[in-house]
Design a protein with these regions (language model features):
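A short secondary-structure junction signal
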Residues: 5-7, 31-36, 55-61, 77-80, ...
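PLP-dependent enzyme catalytic core of the Aspartate aminotransferase-like
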Residues: 193, 202, 206-236
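Conserved PLP-binding catalytic core of the aspartate aminotransferase-like
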Residues: 160-191
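Active-site phosphate-binding strand-loop segment of PLP-dependent enzymes
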Residues: 2-52
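Active-site C-terminal subdomain of aminotransferase-like
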Residues: 70-151, 165, 234-236
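A short linear hydrophobic-aromatic micro-motif
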Residues: 159-163, 195-201
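Conserved active-site segment immediately N-terminal to the catalytic lysine
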Residues: 46, 60-71
């Protein structure tokens, strides 16, 4: 098997003595996403939400810690958002550097060191933009529409093929392939010439990958699908 699905996780397989369990909520490389969270009992669940923060509603109460780099949906790189349960703060090992101790930042209102002010300012603008669109719930509805436009086409096509098990598909990153590597290369070249950039799949996976982060409008996804239909007609 390959990493194109989220495995079923049986609670009995989790060690109750573990310090924490970790998942990547949305895998940008393989295009998978957790739709059902593992039941870890009393052991804290930790997750990276860098690629889905602000894109869908998340019940943060189910986690011990969530963290996200800003660079996908929040703003320029340089800011990390951390949501941590109060009882998990202040338990750092003695060898933990000051800057890597969450208590340092919690006690100093995230101002222990000089913050990246411009990146934080841009993040604030993005937060206001999300609120103006109706909040995260409204943004999620838009993202679901975008994803359905692309996935519906992939499911109906016998030329393009989505690579992820349908129930585990990401709203943000959709990998897909054509029947041959030659066609993959031709599609990427022609798509780039037509103005569709960064469609080449991750180097470890190959094929193509369409990223549909919050800033991508529905119209952008529809134009991509229209181009894919044209390419299919001309090359099938």
């Amino acid at each position: 098997k390959v990493f194109n699905y989220i495995p079923e996780l049986d609670k009995s397989k989790f060690d109750p003595e573990a310090d924490y369990f970790y998942i990547t909520y949305n895998n940008t490389i393989y295009g998978t996403r957790y739709t059902t969270l593992p039941d870890t009992g009393n052991v804290p669940l930790v997750t990276d939400i860098s690629s889905i923060i602000l894109s869908e509603e998340i019940d943060v109460s189910k986690f011990g810690l969530l963290f996200a780099g800003a660079q996908k949906n929040v703003g320029p790189a340089g800011v990390t958002v951390v949501i941590i349960r109060d009882d998990l703060i202040g338990n750092a090992m003695d060898i933990t550097p000051t800057m890597l101790d969450y208590k340092t930042h919690a006690d100093n209102d995230s101002l222990y060191n000089t913050p990246p002010t411009f990146a934080i300012y841009v993040a604030g603008l993005v937060f206001e933009w999300v609120k103006e669109r109706g909040g995260v719930k409204a943004v999620q509805e838009i993202n679901e529409k975008k994803a359905s436009i692309l996935y519906d086409f992939l499911d109906a096509s016998d030329f393009f093929k989505g690579t992820v098990v349908p129930k585990d598909r990401s709203l943000m990153n959709a990998p897909f392939v054509l029947p041959t590597e030659e066609l993959n290369a031709k599609f990427i070249k022609e798509a780039t010439a037509a103005g569709f950039v960064n469609l080449k799949g991750h180097r470890t996976v190959g094929g193509m990958r369409a990223s549909m982060y919050n800033a991508m409008p529905i119209e952008g996804v529809q134009k991509l699908v229209d181009f894919m239909k044209k390419f299919e007609m001309e090359n099938k």
